[in-house]
Structure formats: structure tokens, C-alpha cells
Swiss-Prot record:
Cellular location(s): Nucleus
Sequence similarity: Belongs to the Integrator subunit 14 family.
Disulfide cross-links: none
UniProt cross-references to SUPFAM superfamilies, sorted A to Z: vWA-like
Name of this chain's protein: Integrator complex subunit 14
Subunit structure: Component of the Integrator complex, composed of core subunits INTS1, INTS2, INTS3, INTS4, INTS5, INTS6, INTS7, INTS8, INTS9/RC74, INTS10, INTS11/CPSF3L, INTS12, INTS13, INTS14 and INTS15. The core complex associates with protein phosphatase 2A subunits PPP2CA and PPP2R1A, to form the Integrator-PP2A (INTAC) complex. INTS14 is part of the tail subcomplex, composed of INTS10, INTS13, INTS14 and INTS15.
A Pfam family of this chain: IntS14_C
Length: 515
């Protein structure tokens, strides 16, 4: 998941730190040292991660937009200037803006806030922001919780005793609470020095940036892989005392199934599966990046000559048009499949299903799936022209019939236009007109969209006034009748199961004969 590093460059970060030796350090130097350590780790183990660098004081500035070039990020650390007072709220607003602009509101993001624990002074300080949080309008709301899935990690260039001497720690903890409890505060253990800063950032790396290594198994074939991004623990909301479920480091393939049968299932998350080549001594080859391009190329050449099960699996799934079902834990499955980035490039991906014995209802229970050879006859037919899926449920599904869907404005517009087209062809299209009218009426009542009924009634009355002199007399009667019935349906006394029927007129018989 993307990372935004938010660096405090206010005057308080220039406070000197007494460190052994002749060189004088400031708190911002300690912060830059810790971030350099983080960037070096990510360049080696998280090189697919996108990272952005934001600096702030009373205002915020995007120093480096989202990038995978960690050399650029490290250069920006050495080019930061000092500014005025601290305003954490402006920094959080900046994070909201750049993440939503780049990734939208659905992609999880990690925010690493590096500060010295000073909250600012007066208006714009964190104390003032938290005190006035509940007195704001919606357009000026406090930026937490972030409008996207996130974790907020606060790296304090101060020890716990210094923060507890004021209310700084309490205010920073409020930030984590406002972010739905997603995140953590890190402080320096002991005196402020480079070693203790490294230790603090090491804890962050262990918590959030440790690569997930696993062993992919299929029978006697195995491969060491890295799953990126790291799968997050999943909590089942229905449980009384929920315990986070974590996937196993042994990923065992339990079977294969056609892509058409798996269709497009709901998943919790998607991950890249990257092979890790090992040499005879068990050291990683070709994993991560090195400073020396020649060493990197030679390592990649060595890794490319070693047979790897991941390559075999990826190619087979791509050619055969199948997916592999993989067991992640007790009653928890996922699928491995090939996904194309472009016409020439594709990747081995893994998607995680929701935990449970039956994550995909149309496949039935995972434990009851078996090989084709166990069936008395081929369930796919001799010519591969049929499929045993989807399994037909015993009970009638509520979604078995055609339903009205207005997810997009175009769907609603199409249904209204269909009614108007039939209205202009009355009385020949009387039955079709009332069929579409009743379908729209029921959908509008189900959604509570009463204004739609009033609007369509007004449109029908307008169509009635626009009828040409050559129009059949029955058309005007039917349009007026339909408009009146829609207006009645828009009241609180409307009955959902009631159907609007055509008005019987002296002209109805002749129109029916023409139909």
C-alpha cells in the first residue's frame, strides 16, 4: 500500500541535541537519519511501494510526489529548509488531498508522521484544532479520520518523559483515536541519539514494513515467494470475541478450476506473488536492489537460470485459462491467477476470499470440491460444452428475476425514456407502456424515490398536451390516467403490490383489435 511520509520542518525541530562527539545535531537531523534508514529498507525489501514526502510547518508542501525512486526521496531529505510554527492540521489536510488525488478513496495508505511532539501555539495548534473539532461545519471538518483506509504512525523525536511533561502525548493519542484507532505512536527510548532513533524506526519497520515471505506448495513442488503488499490480519465482525485471522506462511494449492467457473468473485485484497530465488547456501539471490548495477544484473542472471515453480505455475494458469485454489488457513481460501498488465507483461496474483467454509456460494463448500476423475461422468461434458457450476440452491433466490438497477444515472434515464417512447405510440403500445410504468413505480417505491413518480407524472401530462391533432383519442385518456395514478403512488398511502391498469374507454375496444 502507498506510504506518505510527513516531515515536521518547523523551528522546534532545529533544537540542538547533545550527542557524544564534536558534531552538533538537531532533532531534524535525527529525523532525517531515521527516515534514511526507512527508505533504505524499503528500497531493498519494498521496492514496489509508492512513497511520497510532505513537509509542513504552518503550511504544507509536497516535496516528492509518489515514486519508487528512493534516491530522490533521500536527496529531498538533505534539501529541506526550516520554517515557522507547527500546524499539524494543515499537514493532515495535505495528506488527504494528495492521496485522494493520486489513489482515490478506496486504496489503503500508510501515513508516517515525523515530529518532535510540539503541538504549535495559538490558533492552528493541535490543541486548538482538537478543542474546536465539534464546533465546525461539514465543509471545514477536521481531516481525521482520513477519507480512505489508513494507518497513522507518529514518530516522535522525543522520549516518553519529555512528552508526558506536557499534554503532547495525550493530544497525539487523540489523533490515533480519531483515525478509528488505526495506527501507533513511537517514542525514543532513553536519551536522544542516533542509536535510539534507529531502534525506534526499526520497530516501525518490524510492524509495518516487514516483507511477507511464504512457501508456495503444490504436491511435491515448492517455491519461496514474497507476497506484496503484506496481507493484513482479518477480523470477522460476526464473532463475539473476534480474533484476527492471519494467513499461513505455507500456501498450499488444493486444486485448479476454470476461470469461467470462478467468474469474478468478491475478495478481501489482491497481492503480487513474487518468486525468491535461493542459492545453494540458502541466501536470497535477485531479491531487492543493490547500489551496484553490475551486481544486480549478475544476481538476476543467476536467478533466471534456476528453475522455479512460480514460473511454471504462472505460465500454466495463463495458457490453460485456469486459477489455482490455495489454502490460506483453516477454512480460509484464496486463488492464484495470471493478470495481464499489458499485452506483453503479466503477473502472478493472489486474491483472498472471506474466511469461511463457503466463500463463493456458486461453488458450494470448498471441502466438498474434488477432482473430475472422482465423478461417474465428466461434469464438463465430452466436448467441454457444459459446467457443473453454478450450483443451484435449494431455496429460490431473491435475485433470480430481473430487477431494476439504477446504480448509474444512465440506467434511470433509459427506463424513463422507454416509458416516453411507448407513450408516444399509444394506443398500439398500451400493454408495453403499462408494463414499463408499473416496473418503474415499484422500483421507485422500493427505493423511496417518490420525487421520481411526481416527475414522470408531470412528463406524461406534458406529453398529453403535445399530442398532435391526428393522435388517437384514447392516447390522451391513457396518459392522463397514468399521470394521476403516479401522483397517487407518490403519497404515503401507496400500495407497493398495486398495479396500474389501462383505463377502459369507448376507444379501448378498437385499439385492442389493432394490437
Amino acid at each position: 500500500m502507498p506510504t506518505v511520509v510527513v516531515m515536521d520542518v518547523s523551528l522546534s525541530m532545529t533544537r540542538p541535541v547533545s550527542v557524544e562527539g564534536s558534531e552538533e545535531y538537531q532533532r531534524k537531523h535525527l529525523a532525517a537519519h531515521g527516515l534514511t534508514m526507512l527508505f533504505e529498507h524499503m528500497a531493498t525489501n519494498y521496492k514496489l511501494e509508492f512513497t511520497a514526502l510532505v513537509v509542513f510547518s504552518s503550511l504544507w508542501e509536497l516535496m516528492v510526489p509518489f515514486t519508487r525512486d528512493y534516491n530522490t526521496l533521500q536527496e529531498a531529505l538533505s534539501n529541506m529548509d526550516d520554517y515557522d510554527k507547527t500546524c499539524l492540521e494543515s499537514a493532515l489536510v495535505g495528506v488527504c488531498n494528495i492521496v485522494q488525488q493520486e489513489w482515490g478513496g478506496a486504496i489503503p495508505c500508510q501515513v508516517v508522521l515525523v515530529t518532535d511532539g510540539c503541538l504549535g501555539i495559538g490558533r492552528g495548534s493541535l490543541r486548538h484544532s482538537l478543542a474546536t473539532q465539534n464546533q465546525r461545519s461539514e465543509s471545514n471538518r477536521f481531516p481525521l479520520p482520513f477519507p480512505f483506509p489508513s494507518k497513522l504512525y507518529v514518530m516522535c523525536m522525543a522520549n516518553l518523559e519529555e512528552l508526558q511533561s506536557t499534554d503532547s502525548l495525550e493530544c497525539l493519542e487523540r489523533l490515533i483515536d480519531l483515525n478509528n484507532g488505526e495506527g501507533q505512536i513511537f517514542t525514543i527510548d532513553g536519551p536522544l541519539c542516533l542509536k535510539n532513533v534507529q531502534s525506534m524506526f526499526g520497530k516501525l519497520i518490524d510492524l509495518a514494513y516487514t516483507p511477507f515471505h511464504a512457501v508456495l506448495k503444490c504436491g511435491h513442488l515448492t517455491a519461496d515467494v514474497q507476497v506484496f503488499p503484506r496481507p493484513e490480519p482479518f477480523v470477522i465482525d460476526e464473532e463475539i470475541d473476534p480474533i484476527p485471522k492471519v494467513i499461513n506462511t505455507d500456501l498450499e494449492i488444493v486444486g485448479f478450476i476454470d476461470i469461467a467457473d470462478i467468474s469474478s468473485p468478491p475478495v478481501l485484497s489482491r497481492h503480487l506473488v513474487l518468486p525468491i530465488a535461493l542459492n545453494k547456501e540458502g541466501d536470497e539471490v535477485g531479491a531487492g536492489i543493490t547500489d551496484d548495477n553490475e551486481d544486480e544484473n549478475s544476481a538476476n542472471q543467476i536467478a533466471g537460470k534456476i528453475p522455479n515453480f512460480c514460473v511454471l505455475l504462472h505460465g500454466s494458469l495463463k495458457v490453460e485459462g485456469m486459477v489455482a485454489l490455495v489454502q490460506l488457513g483453516p477454512e480460509w481460501h484464496g486463488m492464484l491467477y495470471s493478470q495481464a498488465d499489458s499485452k506483453k507483461k503479466s503477473n502472478l496474483m493472489m486474491s483472498l476470499f472471506e474466511p469461511g467454509p463457503e466463500p463463493l456460494p456458486w461453488l458450494g463448500k470448498m471441502a466438498q470440491l474434488g477432482p473430475i476423475s472422482d465423478a461417474k461422468e465428466n461434469p464438463y461434458g465430452e466436448d467441454d460444452n457444459k459446467s457443473p457450476f453454478p450450483l443451484q440452491p435449494k431455496n429460490k433466490r431473491s435475485y433470480a428475476q430481473n430487477v431494476t438497477v439504477w446504480i448509474k444515472p444512465s440506467g434511470l434515464q433509459t427506463d424513463v425514456q422507454k416509458i416516453l417512447r411507448n407513450a408516444r405510440k399509444l394506443p398500439e403500445k398500451t400493454q408495453t407502456f403499462y408494463k414499463e410504468l408499473n416496473r418503474l413505480r415499484k422500483a421507485a417505491l422500493a427505493f423511496g424515490f417518490l420525487d421520481l413518480l411526481k416527475g414522470v407524472a408531470d412528463m406524461l401530462e406534458r406529453e398529453c398536451t403535445l399530442l398532435p391533432d391526428t393522435a388517437h383519442p384514447d392516447a390522451a385518456f391513457q396518459l392522463t390516467h397514468a399521470a394521476q395514478q403516479l401522483k397517487l403512488a407518490s403519497t404515503e398511502y401507496a400500495i407497493y403490490d398495486h398495479n396500474i391498469t389501462p383505463l377502459h374507454t369507448d376507444f379501448s375496444g378498437s385499439s385492442t383489435e389493432r394490437m
